[in-house]
Amino acid sequence: IRKPSHSGLVAIAVAAALSGVAHAADKPARAPATIGDLKPRAVEIRKEQKVEGSAARAIDNYRRYLEQKDADPELRAEALRRLGDLNLEVGEGERIEKEVSAIDRSGAEAIELYTSLLKAYPDYPRNDQVLYQLARAYETTGQPEKALATLDQIAERYPGLVQRDEVDFRRGEILFSNKRYAEAEKAYKRALDAGANGAFYSQSLYKHGWSLFKQGQNEDSLPSFARVLDANLTDRSNGDKLRPIERMSRADRELVEDTLRVMSITFSYLDGATSVDQFVAKRGVPPYSYLLYSRLGDLFVEKQRYQDAADVYRAFVARDPADENAPILAMQAIEAYRKG
């Protein structure tokens, strides 16, 4: 009996692996963004662990399998997809090590594999995921316009995609970075359709508010920013009480602090204390009302607008003199008068 060659063994092993999971529901990683400082920045995808030698061996095996001219078409499509995914993973792992040439090489190969798959197998049932990964590969290799075009294609062809909220959020991020704020606003709004339980809900609200702010629609941006605070500061399980900022994760804390900051700036552009009073009344006096007054007053102190600062602090005391924070703001009002 003839023993199969090494390449034959590889083909058998790879085919077995592919046939067992050809239709498994792989799901791309969805990491929330980290928003820091006042200036909004794009979402940061959590760094992958560096790919070790086992991945390199898998890449080699898939390449050998694809060399087999009699490979099953369905399994060949699956092998192309998996090889593309592995190359993309390798490139992202190298990015952690700042090996730019390796990123370009692995990312370029992933792009070539995905585009070949889409061309050769237009009816492959997992082309939605192939396009999703292709967009990631374009982003990894610094080609945002091609990434955007691919994400647009996904949005048009696969409206029911599980990762649709992430697709729209990423579209928004690219559009926002290109200063196409009106289009970014629509993309973030579409991402919000996933609901409050969506992985990109708070980030989409935040950037939706920023998109309006960047278009000069300052007052219109406030409801989106307030919904960020509603989602992060209102403790629904504890009688809608204020959730302590200091107990939040770093990412959530930065998101909340930046939201409070941009809202303070917006109120300062409007009518100061009067604007906060009207906004809080319209929102039904949310549990974080104290923070809106406090942060606006602090901003006015930074700008040496001491009379305005005192007016804001006093406005909160007048609105809710029995609040536990009222004495604190009353003292801050006195201090602002003293400085002015």
State where each predicted segment sits.
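Bacterial N-terminal signal peptides
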Residues: A11-S19
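Acidic, polar-rich low-complexity tracts and alpha-helical solenoid repeat scaffolds
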Residues: V21-G340
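Terminal low-complexity, poorly structured segments
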Residues: S5, V14, P144-A147
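Bacterial N-terminal signal peptides that target proteins for export
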Residues: I1-V10
